[in-house]
Swiss-Prot record:
This is Large ribosomal subunit protein bL9. It comes from Bacillus anthracis. PROSITE patterns: RIBOSOMAL_L9. Keywords: Ribonucleoprotein, Ribosomal protein, RNA-binding, rRNA-binding. One of its GO terms (biological process) is translation.
Length: 148
């Protein structure tokens, strides 16, 4: 029996795949558990429409990430912090502080977890911070830390 997998089934198939499975397995397990649906003409058309919609959404998401990358790479985030001798900061600048500053000054809202910082910023001056906007798109934001 041909079925369309609605969820991932270990060893049998992934969500969205169409496969031939034994009739008993399909009727007694996959269909009853809601893990798969019978592959009829109408369900195949629905699956194709759903795949096209997902591809369209993914393309739109990628395009918006590319536009945001262009915007981010043009701007500089200004932060002020107290510092001691040699330009060392008292404390550090975290990704949360960078996000808050971007929200305040440039009205750009990002998740702090998208920032890829090995360590927090602990010195005055300019620092380039990588932001992962999409699995295929990463941007570099220039952060300027000046003395308060």
């Amino acid at each position: 029996m041909k079925v369309i997998f609605l969820k991932d089934v270990k060893g049998k198939g992934k969500k969205g795949e169409v496969k031939n499975v034994p009739d008993g397995y399909a009727n007694n397990f996959l269909l009853k558990q809601g893990l798969a649906a019978e592959a009829t003409n109408s369900s195949m058309k629905t699956l194709e429409a759903q795949k096209r919609k997902e591809e369209k959404d993914a393309a739109a998401e990628l395009e918006s990430a590319k536009q945001l990358k262009e915007t981010l790479e043009k701007l500089t985030v200004e932060l002020k912090a107290k510092s001691g001798e040699g330009g060392r900061l008292f404390g550090s600048i975290t990704s949360k502080q960078i996000v808050d500053a971007m929200q305040k000054s440039h009205k750009i809202k990002l998740d702090k977890r998208k920032f890829e910082m090995d360590d927090a910023i602990r010195a005055l001056g300019y620092t380039n911070v990588t932001v992962k906007l999409h699995p295929q798109v990463t941007a570099t934001v220039k952060v300027h830390v000046s003395e308060q």
